[in-house]
Amino acid sequence: MAIAIVILQNDPARAERLVASMKSVSATVRTVQSIAELEKLASRLPIQVGVLDLDLVTLQEIAGLRRQFGIEIVCTHHAPDDAMWTAALRAGALDCCFVDDAPGICRAIQQSMAA
């Protein structure tokens, strides 16, 4: 089954690097500039996975995206720690990865889709 991945990152250049990396997981990868844009897109198209920067989204927004749209979330941050990782997982995220850890992000997505 083809999956659609949406990337919301604080740095547009980083977002484009993640798009290139995510192409190994899915041919359908898009970027958005805000949580509002992501919600609008998800209301029109089936989005299976969001790769979301914790500098731009709250844990409550992550929980809301999971509840409202069923989107699997991989959080990213420039310096995630154990407390942030635990909080992200409690909010429903699959994982919380360093923002530049494309292999880890891809692995989290692939493990979720295989389950």
Where are these regions (language model features)?
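Conserved acidic segment of CheY-like receiver
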Residues: A2-P12, L18-M22, G50-V51
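Conserved phosphotransfer microenvironments
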Residues: A15, Q48-F69, P80-M84
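Short hydrophobic/Thr-rich beta-strand motif most characteristic of the beta2 strand and flanking loop
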Residues: S26-S34
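Acidic, metal-coordinating helix/loop segments flanking the phosphotransfer/catalytic sites
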Residues: Q33-V49, L56
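Conserved phosphotransfer cores of two-component systems
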Residues: S43-L45, L65-I71, A91
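Two-component signal transduction core modules
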Residues: G50, I73, C96-C97
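Alpha4 helix (beta4-alpha4-beta5 surface) of REC/receiver domains from two-component response regulators
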Residues: H77-C97
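Receiver (REC) domain switch/output surface
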Residues: I105-A115
